[in-house]
Amino acid sequence: MKNKKTEQAFWGYLLIMPVFLGLMIFYIIPFFQNFYFSFTEIGIFGGSTWVGLDNYKKIFVDKEFWQSLKNTFKYVIIAVPLGISISTVLAVLLNTKIKFKGLFRTIYFLPVIAMASASGAVWKWIYNKDFGILNFCLSFFGFEHISWLNNPTTSLYAVVVVMIWMKIGYNMIILLAGLQSIPKSLYEAAKIDGASEIRQFFFITLPLLTPSLFFVGIMTLISTFQVFDIIYMMVNKYSIAINESTSVVSLFYRYAFEFNEKGYASALAAILFFIIIMITLLQFHIKKKWVHE
């Protein structure tokens, strides 16, 4: 019996070893390396000099950082609730008896599997001031052509639309799975009691969907805090709107790969990680107050 348990444990550890090694090599070790580098100044040829908290002191008086942090929170505050709301509505509609369910699911999920570079290029064309399809359609209603991505007022919101569009499909599939796990007997009992569809949604569907909503909220929040690729593809770095649309990760990229200030960039990454962890822990703390278990 003891040998059998030992053998089972051996095969268990052996099977999880690839995942563990992947986590160590690509996540855990780089995390501690980044944290160490945030206290150093790294030269062009890789040599590092210990500077202590200088990088962090520089960040807290850097107007660029505060602007990028403000932009990042704007992305989160707008894209997360709006994206989840749209995904929920679509999931509820696709959970009803409608034709071509599979086709609609595929169409809504396509942006998820599309490369960010390709999506960014397509939307950049849609937003183009001179020959973009959006301005072309708006011109029929008497609107003048708008430079969506080069206007400091509109650039951030133009990027938000694309972010929501790219995440809707994934969130919708998760929420749809949550909807299908709700017992139909609850709806049948509610109908017998005379509850309308709206009351069924708010008193049955929404409460029982909260575990899925919580998961989707956490994942969407983290990915939105890390937004970079869409901004990089859509907003020109020489545009007058770049300061109004730059995220913290975009600023990290600029300092790490354009200015070659990798120590400062590592400090930016460490601060963003701390912010994400704190907000995620806060969500887990208040989870019991609204998530159905």
For each of these PLM feature ranges, what is it?
Residues 4-293:
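A structural signal for multi-pass alpha-helical bundles of membrane permease subunits
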